Amino acid sequence: SSALLLYFNPEITITRGNKVPEDFEGIIFDIGRGKYDHHQRDSRIRENGIPYAAFGLLWEELGTEILGEELAAKFDESFIQPLDINDNTGEKNELATLIGNFNPSWDVENGENEAFSRAVQTAGMILVNMFEKYKGNERAEKRVEEILAAHNSSVLSGEKSESEAKILVFPEFVPCQKQLRETDIAFIIFPSNRGGYCIQPLKKEHSLNYLSLIHI
């Protein structure tokens, strides 16, 4: 939650505590029985039955401004919700365990604030990488749609033969396996960063694509 708020506004100051000061003005989360505190009997639950934690409540408020409505919903489902489940139930989550390992040992005096700062910094880097990954995937989907549309047009016009119809050539590498899985494309070709070209079969759920190639 702290990492998300700092991503949204790096100028804010995060203050830790178990009680909200009477004169406090700012965003309060995880305590205080307010909008972003899930430690309440009437705490909110998603339509799919997954309860919100503070992270999810803050993401609901800020996520669309970071990723847009569609991507924010996908990010909530795949990234936020598993962490909210962990926060609410203790169900194992590798990322939550990673961040939790920043907590100092039980017999170490003080050091909690420093450990918290390192944990937030690490969580912040993870968030930045995840945001960029989701944005990149969205750009890839649009690029694949463009290339596939041009390919299908060439097939319909007769410019490409029946055998060529199942081979999609990319002018550059674009992540596409998942997007093309339900199409008739069997192989993709794209430039290799080592020179020449790479040929990959499409990974179909119930079949394998094989092609004998001449060894050069």
Which residues does each predicted region cover?
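Glycine/small-residue-rich interface belts in oligomeric ring/scaffold proteins
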Residues: S2-A72
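Short, solvent-exposed amphipathic alpha-helical segments in soluble enzyme
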Residues: A3-L6, R181-D184, K204
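Structural motif
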Residues: I12-T13, G26-I27, A165-L168, I185-I188, ...
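A broadly conserved detector of short glycine/acidic/proline-rich loop/turn motifs that flank catalytic sites
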Residues: R33, Q40, V174, N193, ...
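A structured phosphate/pyrophosphate-recognition subdomain
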Residues: G49-K178, F190-R194
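Gly/Ser/Thr-rich active-site loops/lids in small-molecule metabolic enzymes
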Residues: I185-S192, L208-Y210
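A C-terminal functional module that forms or caps the active site or interfaces directly
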Residues: Q200-S212
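Conserved small/polar residues in nucleotide/adenosyl-binding loops
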Residues: I214-I216
